[in-house]
Amino acid sequence: MLPQDDMTDEMKSLASRLEDTTQAFYDLALIVYNLEDTTPSDAIPESLDTLIRDLKSLPDISRKVNNLIPQDVLEYIEQGRNPDVYARQFSELVQKDNQYVNGKLYAIEGFQKAFAEEIKQAYPEVSSVVDKILNEGKVESTVS
């Protein structure tokens, strides 16, 4: 869940309503589980009314929130897994892929420099053209 400082008022309202709805489910389950002859006769209907009221308010509040949740995260949660674990695993995967791409870039830049030097040694008359090509194509080198 987002830190409270990063949440909009709509998100805070939705989070609060979801907590209330979850609490209403819990309260109803508790009443049913502990049902005795001494339980007030209106306890279950009142709890159901609260739950229904909370459930009815969710669509109105959720329409005001424009945050999209990736389907993968929803499936992860539906399987009873922690979305924080998903975020950590996703970050690690992105970092791993980034390192792989940076390694390939490093290798290509190294090959480019070595190839340019070989061309300059074999054909000294085109060394100025090779230097020009290297300088024009250079954005930001990662190879030292």
UniProtKB/Swiss-Prot annotation:
Signal peptide: none annotated. It is found in: Cytoplasm; Nucleus; Nucleus envelope. It comes from the Eukaryota. One of its GO terms (biological process) is positive regulation of transcription initiation by RNA polymerase II. Keywords: Activator, Cytoplasm, Nucleus, Transcription, Transcription regulation. GO terms for cellular component: cytoplasm; mediator complex; nuclear envelope; nucleus. The keyword Cell membrane does not apply. One of its GO terms (molecular function) is transcription coactivator activity. Pfam families: Med10. Its main location: cytoplasm. Component of the Mediator complex. Belongs to the Mediator complex subunit 10 family. Component of the Mediator complex, a coactivator involved in the regulated transcription of nearly all RNA polymerase II-dependent genes. Mediator functions as a bridge to convey information from gene-specific regulatory proteins to the basal RNA polymerase II transcription machinery. Mediator is recruited to promoters by direct interactions with regulatory proteins and serves as a scaffold for the assembly of a functional preinitiation complex with RNA polymerase II and the general transcription factors. This is Mediator of RNA polymerase II transcription subunit 10.
